[in-house]
Amino acid sequence: MGFRGKGSGMVANRAYKFRIYPNDEQKILFAKTFGCVRMVYNHWLDRKIRQYEENKTNVTYTICAKEMATMKKTEEYRFLKEVDSIALQQSLRHLDTAFQNFFKQPKTGFPRFKSKKRNKSSYSTLCINGNITLSNGYLRLPKIGQVRLKQHRSVPSEYRLKSVTVSQTPSGKYHASILFEYEEQVQERKLQKFLGLDFSMHELYRDSNGKEPAYPGYYRNAEKKLARE
């Protein structure tokens, strides 16, 4: 769970993971989306590696996104339009983060290409203008539609849905990790009482109520004795 400041409270994030049950048509769309985000990641990872090896520079996310928009208009890659466009953009953002980390620590090597066998099938998408909803046991996703969901925990009504990561296990089970944002109120304590302390040479201190500490007078007695000597 993460926090950040906003107004008088703290904005916190909380994720819920639910099992989802897509129908056969939705399973096909999920498989297409998993494949497309993996292809996008690998295509521009190769592009970034080649440019880095040529002149030690990086291909920015903005450039990659523009190139992808152009690619989607071609006959060869028009299938990219069949899946959630935000999921493809998120794949490029994840790649950009991975490559930025490589720039900070080049000795770690380039990010690895994603493999269907080695990597878990998943994709992430963002909630924009209410395009994702969770209601009455169904999760509505862009390009996918209403997916049946087993909601074993209730979500407070004031929580705001931010993003969803859909994943498939090797055994074929589907899950949705849903990230919510909410404002956590900070309890302000009212000042009940104020006490001032006045330090002096005659006593250790005197508070604003006129009280003095009842410490033994060893120091003062020794001071008087030294003065007599």
Describe every region a protein language model picked out:
Residues 1-229:
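Nucleic-acid substrate recognition interfaces
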